[in-house]
Amino acid sequence: MIRLRTLIEKNRSESRKKIVSSTLDSLPEGCISNIISFTSPEDACVAAAVSKIFESAVKSDIVWEKFLPTDYESLITPSRVFSSKKELYFSLCNDPLLIEDGKMSLWLEKASGKRCIMLSATAMNLSSMADMSQRFLWIPCPESRFETVAALREAYRFEFNCRMNTRVLSLRTRYSVYIVFKKADNWCGFKGVSIEAVVGIVGEESFRSFICFDTHGKGQARKRKVVAKPELREDGWMETEIGEFYNEGGLMSSDEVEISTVEGKYAQQKRGLVILGIEIRPAKILEEFSVCRL
């Protein structure tokens, strides 16, 4: 009896889908494109699988121009030509652009179109810190999108403080902040060490947490706070989440996000930390989708 009821409900659901699909298919293709443009890139790719007319409508520049940043024309070089706005969109997702004189890189999150940013180690102002000015070696790295990365020679405390204007980010979006790094052959001094990290919009309440760079470190920190442990990325680097913040403003915003670390008084000698930079991306990363084969 239960099985029969389940089959009936399944048939009803499939019938509703066919009715909706049939109704929408009767609309002009341009109208369908306009409707889809108010969704998201992920939803558009799902819609393309509904029917042939939907697949054709999703290819329209009307759809993908809505998903592009409003200032996208200033982000691409005039000499580069794209066959469609969809091709341009996925180029901005897959090929990070260097901005701010090569101190930052920008790309779009594929599923949502939200902006992502990486601050290079240079933009972290490591060399401006009094105790850190001579403690980093700036070296070229073929694996990096930036000209140089920062390799820690020797220091008792790993501390930095940097700021970035939020206008380069997507408005009304919650972001997660990560420090991206590798371990050099002379890596030492980080085992069991937890470092306090602070992230927040200047003038507003900040997000405080504890991080560690050692994958074998303890799971708990002072005051019973959980320590964020590093994870291996697809590009071979490691990352540790520093914190989160909410970006309300957009291109005209004058807000700044401040990111810093503070180590306790019981510091120990450290070396061998290679820093690529600080990555800022939407806090709720949507799952990768692969149906976009248009």
UniProtKB/Swiss-Prot annotation:
Domain F-box, chain residue ranges per copy: 21-67
Pathway listed: Protein modification; protein ubiquitination
Biological processes annotated in GO: protein ubiquitination
Stored SMART domains: FBOX
InterPro entries: F-box-like_dom_sf (IPR036047), F-box_dom (IPR001810), PP2-like (IPR025886)
Protein name: F-box protein SKIP3
Pfam families, alphabetized: F-box, PP2
Stored CDD domains: F-box_AtSKIP3-like
Record's subunit section: Part of a SCF (SKP1-cullin-F-box) protein ligase complex. Interacts with SKP1A/ASK1.
Highest taxon of source: Eukaryota
Disulfide-bonded cysteines: none
Keyword list, A-Z: Ubl conjugation pathway
